[in-house]
UniProtKB/Swiss-Prot annotation:
One of its GO terms (molecular function) is dephospho-CoA kinase activity. One of its GO terms (biological process) is coenzyme A biosynthetic process. Its EC number is 2.7.7.3. It is an enzyme of class 2 (transferase). InterPro entries: Archaeal_FAD_synthase, Cyt_trans-like, PPAT_arch, Rossmann-like_a/b/a_fold. Transmembrane segments: none annotated. Keywords: ATP-binding, Coenzyme A biosynthesis, Cytoplasm, Nucleotide-binding, Nucleotidyltransferase, Transferase. Belongs to the eukaryotic CoaD family. Pathway: Cofactor biosynthesis; coenzyme A biosynthesis. Reversibly transfers an adenylyl group from ATP to 4'-phosphopantetheine, yielding dephospho-CoA (dPCoA) and pyrophosphate. It comes from Pyrobaculum aerophilum (strain ATCC 51768 / DSM 7523 / JCM 9630 / CIP 104966 / NBRC 100827 / IM2). This is Phosphopantetheine adenylyltransferase. It catalyses: (R)-4'-phosphopantetheine + ATP + H(+) = 3'-dephospho-CoA + diphosphate.
Length: 155
């Protein structure tokens, strides 16, 4: 199968995997032959998350398992990122970036950084938000908060 782009990138913390992550990852597999996923390091995640995320090794294993279900035939590379940009700002092979509405500004910043380095901008694909049955935006943080509510705990 011929895909629109040879090399597609996306990134995130991927702590508690949910359908929003599936949508993001599936979009990348629909448009790209090779997928590069930037996964935040534990130290970088601790700078912007208000809670302790799962260890990098656990998040990576979960992400690999999910990608093997979404696109088992696809070539996927994983890279640990220590800043908001990762290799997206310096890898000239990257042609497209997939982002959520929440992370779209970061994708545009990445393209600005690429331009400063003399690299062509990537095409930006923005996916819509996934909501739960009550209209709340799904995120790892939201899921964690719901699970921590006293009424959520089973005795």
């Amino acid at each position: 199968m011929k895909y629109k782009f040879r090399n597609v990138v996306l990134g995130g913390t991927f702590d508690t995997l949910h359908s929003g992550h599936v949508k993001l990852l599936a979009t990348a597999t629909l448009i790209g032959d090779r997928i590069l996923i930037g996964l935040t390091s534990d130290s970088f995640a601790s700078t912007y998350k208000q809670y302790k995320v799962r260890p990098f090794s656990v998040r990576l294993a979960n992400l690999r398992n999910l990608m093997s279900l979404i696109a088992p035939e696809r070539e996927v590379a994983y890279v640990e990122i220590h800043d908001p940009y990762g290799p997206a700002v310096f890898d000239p092979r990257l042609e497209a970036i997939v982002a959520s509405i929440e992370t779209a500004p970061r994708a545009l910043q990445i393209n600005d950084e690429r331009a400063k380095r003399g690299l062509r901008p990537m095409e930006v694909f923005i996916i819509s938000t996934v909501r739960d049955g009550y209209g709340h935006t799904l995120s790892s943080t939201y899921i964690r908060r719901v699970l921590e509510r006293p009424e959520s705990k089973q005795s």
